[in-house]
């Protein structure tokens, strides 16, 4: 009789993680059968998708409100089928708003639950820990400091490392990356990453471009490179660029990269850069794994500030840092210019230091290398081991 594992992943990053976990599960239990909501990476590992992953994908609060009836229907169908089929364990991958609610219902019905990718309770809404304690039999976390938080709260937890640490090279090759991007090996290169969402680009791109103008006043030969995830985002960015022109700026999408098509275009740009001006988010971790000096920035719209303040109920976050590299190093290793501090002048000054201070760059490289080594684990094997222990009643 095969071992049945229920799973729900709600976005591409979760699909990628879950696909690798299913591979790890098959190595430990070849007859395992995984089913629920997932995407192509999971299905490539034999996953049975009751609903496609994109059925859970929403873009912002307005889209979420429009999709409430559909999401509630999918939630109800998934819950009923999980309760009927009673898998040996359920694994929710990220998507906490959907998965924690489902995990609570399943756990109350006697189905053990595992949640992979802990919600960012360390940044805001720490009170969610109570919901997690009730809903989750075992947490799988990507960062070592998260393990400490859950251990302190008495929640079973396993630190499994971050999958990106096994994909991004320990020793990046700047010259090879510049060759792929047709950049001169000897020129000074600033990567500009204003985010992947339209709202982020609208808010951050004007500030980042004005900072680039100030930097080019200091160094007219400075090359600025902006990766864009798709042509639509590129068009949105180029509309803003027309208002804040930067001499020689290159806006790059995947088709502009020679070879290495499987690698995200942003990774090639990070690897090629001397320094990076980057929106807070996963891109800061990717930049750190490429060992590049960076300046982290983020600006919420006034409307979003009010929503976040209402939802968090906190005047300050649980940790004093926002950028993942600083959170991991427990130090302001790289500058964070947020909200009213994210002025073109301050961004330009911090970016100039990142571009020109070689001693600082060497220190950053050493610290980020140590961080990379700490995050490098056999994530699929560790996650699969913990899930199988929960499924067999040992977790």
Curated annotation (Swiss-Prot):
* A Pfam match: LpxB
The kind of enzyme this is, by top-level EC class, is transferase
Q: What is its EC number?
A: 2.4.1.182
Q: Name one GO biological process term.
A: lipid A biosynthetic process
Classification via InterPro entries: Glyco_trans_19
Which key words are in the record?
Answer: Glycosyltransferase, Lipid A biosynthesis, Lipid biosynthesis, Lipid metabolism, Transferase
Transport: is it a keyword of this entry?
A: no
From the UniProt record, list the coiled-coil ranges: none
Which pathway does the UniProt entry assign to this protein? Bacterial outer membrane biogenesis; LPS lipid A biosynthesis
The GO terms describing molecular function are: lipid-A-disaccharide synthase activity; phospholipid binding
Q: Which reaction does it catalyse?
A: a lipid X + a UDP-2-N,3-O-bis[(3R)-3-hydroxyacyl]-alpha-D-glucosamine = a lipid A disaccharide + UDP + H(+)
Q: Which family does it belong to?
A: Belongs to the LpxB family.
Q: Check the record and name the NCBIfam families matching this protein.
A: lpxB
Task: Please explain the role this protein plays, according to its UniProt record.
Answer: Condensation of UDP-2,3-diacylglucosamine and 2,3-diacylglucosamine-1-phosphate to form lipid A disaccharide, a precursor of lipid A, a phosphorylated glycolipid that anchors the lipopolysaccharide to the outer membrane of the cell.
PANTHER family named in the record? LIPID-A-DISACCHARIDE SYNTHASE, LIPID-A-DISACCHARIDE SYNTHASE, MITOCHONDRIAL-RELATED
Protein name per UniProt = Lipid-A-disaccharide synthase
Query: What is the scientific name of the source organism?
Result: Bordetella avium (strain 197N)
| Gene designation | lpxB
